[in-house]
């Protein structure tokens, strides 16, 4: 039977997520019973025909329980994958209905056909809507087929897994798999026993620390194990490169006449030094006097194999697992862990306090290779000084930001909590964020504000997968960056995008002056807390 538009309009992953929880609880009970059966068999000391028969029965029971545990484990992961797919479909349906809201002369019939009401819209708009509907239905068919295939394999006995209770994470992958969605990662982690989790954090922190969908406390613990190891390795690499650099430099310096060549190890030395600076700064920020700062969570620690790429990190001020409001700050050009994270965390501290520290966490997210900026020729920057002129970096960065946000949402959803997630992006960071929000899963991000934006890709707020009316922007009067990217594919400055609301700005302020403006900080805090930023609490307090 064909899947239709009228059916997928009502698709929602909530029932599948509930099924994952039910299956997880069943797996844990089955594993307890399997352990008890194995223990009972091991306790038998007698012999004889009756005892032999009993042991045979216990052995058969063990095999049966092992098989059931393996099958339930497969159902957990299959259902989590399907939940991700249904969420994709729900998002695509949202994009279709948002398109209709943007072009109200168009409508979608129960049969999925595009209808025209009122004045005749452009042909390109009708074609675009038809394509969106087609993609939504195609994704629904794909999800249904994939899930049915995995379910039939279990039902028909074609699914085979011979793991026993003696195996690590019986019936489940021992390590997270490449390509998992945050929903799948969360389901896998939720199905593991506490002993299995502790073993993974201890023995494989590199597989856990950056896994979107896991609790922040887990990621923080794993990354804090990794950080000193990565720093030590970076220092050793720098020492080795420095020795090679010095050796060649002695030869160059010894040339008595003629032009002296450039040291061939210069770039490698500078890159290795930047790597050490990144990790040293991060270690300083998340620790104090050799002790961990427990109100900071190290949620991302990505150390590229090659040193020509900067370390990526995300640090939360506050506990994202307990916070009902989680804001993510996305910086613009020139920001690296070594040069930008410290200032971002200072701002995050203030934003959290203004929004209500008891229920708020603020993340400083440097999860992409921010362009170094125009004319940056100093020796402390990776990347090209022309990267900021195109959207290529933003296109590459957007999926990582989406996964990060989705992971926070999913980890809260596992606790039965719908968090209020917001994005606060500056300069090129708004281009990254705007690109991400074009494709983010529906329901994840509740509001976003862009300040000092060269352009955030959309021409109408309906194009971002954020509730309409919850997109904001601030533009200082002497900011020369605002709107400068429109001709380069960045899109118009957000203040010119229908559906975007303006918040406080400074008519005399420059590009990077926003957070020092108390009124802007107040508006950002209200957005973070899910309040209306048009209500000026500073002025109201002054009038009391």
Per-range role (PLM):
Residues 1-167, 396, 410:
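N-terminal secretion-targeting helices of virulence/extracellular proteins
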Residues 133, 137-143, 428, 523-529:
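Short, Φ-rich (hydrophobic/aromatic) sequence segments
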Residues 103-107, 293-296, 360, 496-500:
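Short glycine-aromatic motifs
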Residues 424-433:
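Gly/Ala-rich beta-loop-alpha elbow adjacent to hydrolase catalytic centers
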Residues 156-361, 373-385, 392, 409:
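Long, composition-driven intrinsically disordered regions
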Residues 319-321, 332-419, 437-544:
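Lipolytic serine-hydrolase domain surface
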Residues 39, 315, 434-435:
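Contiguous, well-ordered alpha-helical segments that form the cores/surfaces of helical PPI scaffolds
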Residues 60, 71, 309, 343, ...:
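Short, glycine/acidic-rich beta->alpha junctions
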């Amino acid at each position: 039977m064909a899947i239709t538009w009228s059916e997928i309009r009502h698709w929602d992953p909530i029932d599948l997520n509930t099924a994952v929880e039910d299956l997880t609880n069943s797996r844990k009970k089955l594993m307890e019973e399997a352990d008890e059966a194995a223990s009972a068999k091991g306790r038998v000391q007698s012999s004889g025909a009756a005892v032999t028969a009993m042991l045979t029965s216990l052995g058969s029971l063990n095999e049966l329980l092992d098989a059931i545990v393996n099958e339930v484990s497969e159902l957990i992961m299959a259902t989590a994958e399907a939940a991700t797919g249904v969420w994709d479909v729900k998002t695509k349906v949202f994009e279709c209905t948002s398109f209709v809201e943007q072009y109200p002369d168009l409508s979608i019939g129960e049969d999925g056909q595009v209808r025209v009401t009122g004045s005749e819209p452009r042909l390109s708009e009708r074609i675009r809507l038809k394509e969106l509907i087609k993609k939504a239905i195609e994704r629904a068919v794909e999800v249904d087929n994939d899930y049915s295939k995995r379910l039939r394999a279990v039902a028909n006995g074609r699914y085979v897994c011979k793991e026993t209770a003696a195996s690590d994470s019986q019936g489940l992958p021992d390590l997270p798999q490449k390509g998992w969605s945050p929903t799948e990662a969360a389901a896998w982690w939720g199905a593991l026993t506490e002993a299995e989790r502790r073993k993974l954090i201890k023995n494989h922190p590199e597989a856990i620390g950056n896994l979107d969908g896991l609790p922040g406390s887990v990621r923080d613990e794993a990354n804090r194990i990794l950080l000193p190891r990565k720093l030590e390795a970076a220092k050793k690499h720098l020492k080795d490169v420095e020795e090679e650099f010095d050796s060649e430099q002695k030869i160059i310096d010894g040339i008595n006449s003629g032009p002296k060549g450039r040291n061939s190890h210069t770039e490698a030395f500078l890159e290795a030094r930047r790597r050490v600076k990144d990790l040293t700064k991060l270690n300083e920020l998340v620790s104090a006097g050799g002790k961990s700062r427990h109100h900071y969570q190290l949620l991302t620690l990505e150390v590229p194999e090659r040193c020509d790429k900067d370390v990526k990190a995300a640090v939360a001020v506050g506990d994202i697992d307990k916070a009902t409001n989680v804001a993510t700050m996305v910086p613009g050009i020139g920001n690296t862990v070594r040069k930008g994270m410290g200032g971002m965390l200072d701002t995050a501290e203030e934003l959290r306090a203004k929004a209500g520290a008891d229920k708020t966490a603020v993340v400083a997210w440097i999860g992409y290779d921010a362009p170094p900026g125009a004319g940056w020729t100093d020796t402390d920057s990776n990347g090209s000084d022309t990267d900021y002129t195109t959207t290529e970096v933003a296109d590459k960065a957007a999926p990582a930001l989406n996964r990060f946000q989705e992971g926070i949402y999913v980890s809260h959803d596992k606790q039965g909590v719908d968090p209020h997630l917001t994005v606060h992006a500056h300069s090129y960071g708004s281009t990254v964020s705007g690109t991400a929000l074009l494709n983010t899963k529906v329901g994840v991000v509740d509001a976003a504000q862009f300040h000092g934006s060269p352009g955030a890709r959309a021409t109408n707020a309906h194009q971002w997968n954020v509730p309409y009316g919850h997109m904001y922007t601030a533009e200082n009067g002497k900011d020369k960056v605002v709107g400068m990217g429109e001709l380069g594919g960045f899109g118009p400055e957000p203040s010119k995008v229908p559906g975007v609301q303006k918040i406080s700005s400074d008519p005399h302020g420059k590009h990077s002056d926003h957070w020092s403006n108390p009124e802007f900080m107040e508006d950002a805090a209200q957005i973070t807390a899910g309040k209306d930023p048009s209500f000026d609490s500073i002025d109201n307090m002054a009038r009391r």
